[in-house]
Amino acid sequence: MHLTSREQEKLMLFLAGELAAKRKARGVKLNYPEAIAYIASHLQEAARDGMSVAEVMQYGATLLTVDDVMEGIAEMVHEVQIEATFPDGTKLVTVHNPIR
């Protein structure tokens, strides 16, 4: 199987997001890279599932709370930006202050 650089990047993001989801499910507080991966991978899947850009942005702000991450992480994550594949093409999605 041959994957483009973009496809490899999406696959790595998915894998990191899965690892973060497993840790979160076990009650482990997420660090910075895990929190970003968790949010970004969920945004990618929401876009692929057919949500609109606005719906994906709103959804992204509901994924993690301050209690889900290590101390100080919520203040470090000002925004998460991804290029997501929607049914009508690729679009930039930005979620401001995603950890609330």
Curated annotation (Swiss-Prot):
EC top class, as a word: hydrolase
Pfam families given in the database record: Urease_gamma
EC number: 3.5.1.5
Alphabetical UniProt keywords: Cytoplasm, Hydrolase
Presence of the UniProt keyword Nucleotide-binding in the record: no
GO-annotated molecular function: nickel cation binding; urease activity
Disulfide bridge positions per record: none
Any one GO BP annotation for this protein: urea catabolic process
Record GO cellular component, one term: cytoplasm
Predominant subcellular localization, coarse grouping: cytoplasm
Subcellular location: Cytoplasm
Chemical reaction(s) catalysed: urea + 2 H2O + H(+) = hydrogencarbonate + 2 NH4(+)
The keyword Hydrolase belongs to this UniProt entry's keyword annotation: yes
Family annotation (NCBIfam families): PRK13241.1, urease_gam
PANTHER family (UniProt xref): UREASE (PTHR33569:SF1)
Subunit structure: Heterotrimer of UreA (gamma), UreB (beta) and UreC (alpha) subunits. Three heterotrimers associate to form the active enzyme.
Protein name: Urease subunit gamma
Origin species: Actinobacillus pleuropneumoniae serotype 5b (strain L20)
Lineage summary: Bacteria, Pseudomonadati, Pseudomonadota, Gammaproteobacteria, Pasteurellales
Encoding gene, per UniProt annotation: ureA
